Amino acid sequence: KFGGYVRSYRDEKTGRDMFVQEDYRSVIAVPYDIPVLGYGNNTVNSLRIWDAEPVNTFNLNSFDKGDYQKAIEEENLAKNIVEVLYPNDNHYAGKELRLKQQYFFVSASVQRAVDRYKSMNNVGSEMCIRDSNGDVKNIYKKVTFQLNDTHPTVAVAELMRILMDENGLEWDEAWDITTKTVAYTNHTIMAEALEKWPIELFSRLLPRIYQIVEEINRRFVEEIKAKYPGNQEKVRKMAIIYDGQVKMANLAIVAGYSVNGVAKLHTEILKKQELRDFYEMMPEKFNNKTNGITQRRFLKHANPLLSDWITDKIGDGWVTDLSQLEKLMLYVDDPKAQQDFMQIKYKNKVRLAKYIKENNGIDVDPNSIFDVQVKRLHEYKRQLLNILHVMYLYNQIKRNPDYDMVPRTFIFGAKAAAGYKIAKQTIKLINNVANVINNDASIKGKIKVVFIENYRVSNGEIIFAAADVSEQISTASKEASGTGNMKFMLNGAITLGTMDGANVEIVNEVGAENAQIFGLSSDEVIRFENEGGYDPMEIFNNDQEIRDVLMELINGKYSPEDTEMFRDIYNSLLNNDGGRRADTYFILKDFRSYAEAQRKIDERYRDTNGWAKTVMTNTAKAGKFSSDRTIEEYATEIWKLTKTPVEM
C-alpha cells in the first residue's frame, strides 16, 4: 500500500486504538520460486523473487472520461516498481521509486514469512513448528530477518505493522518479538551509503510505516536521554529521525538483536568510529562475520584446470571443506608442482586473452603480467590511482625507450552507478588512456590497457583464473571487506593492496612476504581525516612526475577533442570543493608508495620459482575465506541453529 492517510479509531470491544490506511494505491506481489540445489546433499532451497501486478489493469471509467493516463495508472505503478532495480536517485522521482521498490519487496517477503509461519503448525508440513504451534508470538523461535545492509530495513516497521494491525498485539509485545527476530549486517563504512530518507517522502509514501518508525524513535530517544542526561550530541548522532531525515542504519541497529560487520578491521572501525555511540550503549549486539566466497563456483566451476590439479594432489575434500587446501603447502617448493601450477595459469591467461580479442579487439600477450582490478567503480576503491600509475609508467617508457620492465597488461572491469558523474568520467579516462597506449607502436607492447565491458560473474570467472596480480587498493579504512580479493587469492594471484577490509586477514593467512602491501594504514587515514586532511598541492608542486601526470588530465593528451573532459577529476585531486576535501581518498598521498609496490611486483615476477611459490601459497592459504565458514558462523552465532544430519 502506497500513499493515502492513516485513520485511527478506538475499538469498543478491545479498547485498543486501531489504525487503518485509506485512500492508498496498491499493487499485487506475485511470487516466483527459483530452486537452489545444494552440492551433493539432497537439499533444495527456494529463492523467492517477486513480480508486481496491478490490482486493476485498466480503469474504464477514467478512460471514458478522457483521462487516458489515469486509466493505466495502476498498471504503470506496478510495471515501474520492477522494471529497473535501484534507478538513479539523483532526483526526487528516482528516490521515490527506490523507496517504493524497497517497501514492495520487503512487505511481500515479510507478509509471506509471517503467513507461512502461522500456517505451518502441523507435523509433516513444509516447516514443522511443533514447539511454536504457529502462534505469531513465537515467530522469533523459527524466523530471523537478516537485514543485508540498510536497503531492507523498512522490514522492522513492516513486521511491527503486521504484528499490531493484523494480529492484534500491543506495542510492547510486538516490539519485543521484532527485536528478537531482526538482525543487521552492515556492509559499508561510507557514511553516504548509510541510507537516509527525507521525512516528507517517507511519510507521504508510507504513512503507517512512518507512524511506527516515529514511535520507535520517540521511545529510543527517551532511552538515550535517560542514559546520557543532557547530551544532545548523542541524540543527534543516534536518533532514527533527526534533521528532516529517517536514518535507516540507526533503525536497523536499534531493532536488531545482532549487528555485524563483514571483516575484522571493518567491525573494529564500526565500533571505534562510525557506530561508536551505538557500541558504547549496546556493545553486546556487535560481532564480526568475515565474508567468504564459494569455492564450488569460483574454483571448481570457474577454473577446472586448477581444480583438477588440486584434486589430483590432495583429493576432492576441499570442495566441501576448503581448509583442506592447506595440504598444498607440501608442494609449494616442489619444482615440478610449481611448473604445473604456472602452466595452468598460462593456459587460463590464453583463455582470457582470447576473450579480450573477441570482445575488445585488443591483442594481449599471455606472457605479460596480467594486472587486474575488477570491481564496482567508486572513488574509495581508487581505480583512479591505478590508471594514473599507468599514465606515469607510460611516461617513463616514452622518456626512455629502453626502460626495463616485464610487459604488463592492465585489466580493468567496473560498473558505476547511473548518477555517479566522476565514476563515469574515470571509466572514460581508462578507455581514453587505453586507446592512446594500445595504438602507440613505439612502446613495443610493454603496456597494454583493457577495459572489460559489462563486468559480471560469467566473465569474472575467466578473469579470476587468469590474474597474476590482484589489485585491492582501496583507501585504508574505507573497504568493508571485499570478496574479489578472495576470488583472486583462491585462483593463485598475489594481492597488491592496502591494509584494508579483508586484505588484512588475507595477509594474516599468507604472510606479508606473500603479498605486496603499500600505502597509509587505516589509523593514519583516520588521523588525517580528523585533522582535516592534507595538502595535495605540496605533492603537486614538489613532484615533477606526478605533476606531469595530473597536467595530462587537462592538456588534451587523452582527450584532444575536449581538454576539459577530465577537469572534474583534476579538481577533485587538488582543490577543496565546498565541504569536500581535496584528494579525499589520498590518491596522491599514496602514489609513490603504490609506484614502488608496482616496481617490486615487476622485480618479484622475474624470480620464476619465488613467484610460483608465492601464488601457490595464496591458493593453499585461502581455506578461511569459504562462504561455508561464513554461513556456518551466521547460523550458529546469530541464528542459533544446530547442525542437522541430512539423509543421503
Regions found by a protein language model. Name each.
Residues 1-126, 130-648:
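A conserved ligand/cofactor-binding region detector
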